[in-house]
Amino acid sequence: DPAALNVFYISQLARKQGIKVLLSGSGGDDLFAGYRRHHALQLQKYWNWMPRGIRASIERETKKLSVSNPFQRKLSKFFNGAGLDGIDRLVNYFRWADDSLLQTLYSKEFINHLGRSHAEDPMVNFITPIVSSHTPLEQMLALEQRFFLADHNLNYTDKMSMATGVEVRVPFLDIDLVNFSARIPNKYKQKGSTGKWVLKKAMENYLPKNV
């Protein structure tokens, strides 16, 4: 993820200017539904009526699209896992590489050690108990906060900033704000194609419109 380099260079520049503490917006997307995959999840209902086999065929065809073309890359990513349903489909939004590709990177010893284990198993085990009591978006946000935010975003942000001697603080992860965001209905987090709607509305009188 090239975002780690962004954090490093921003922190490095701040340090050169004598700034030792920065504020990060990490958590905003994870709490208030701001990622593209949240919008993709919303659009999913419009083609879930298709038979699974047809969706799988569309997935195979879109995998042939050029990754160098931004639109084709997004289209391919959107339909990645189209042949899946339920938890498997939800967890697939967080996949960065297909199992077939990963197998080419692993040694035979490591593959034997893995056995029947899969990288997504912890996510599946985490989300299974709450499937019946939470909406798909709520399930996805739970995965964001438990895995993507904690294991990825906060991880590289801390390592890259501290490598330059700068501390990064995350006001969005104030425990009271996190708990409050969990009580906000989905309709205020997503409105049409607009993510983080309630957050943007709350701040529109304090920030320039282009921000």
Locate the predicted segments by residue:
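Glycine-rich active-site loop/lid subdomains used to bind and stabilize high-energy intermediates
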Residues: 1-165
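Generic structural signal for hydrophobic residues
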Residues: 10, 177, 198-199
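Active-site rim elements
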Residues: 136, 165-168, 186-191
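Short, conserved phosphate/pyrophosphate- and ester-handling motifs at nucleotide-, phospho-/glycolipid
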Residues: 174
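Short, solvent-exposed hinge/capping segments at secondary-structure junctions
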Residues: 178-182
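Short, charged, surface-exposed loops that flank catalytic or proteolytic processing sites
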Residues: 191-197
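Short, intrinsically disordered, charge-balanced linker/junction segments flanking boundaries
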Residues: 208-211
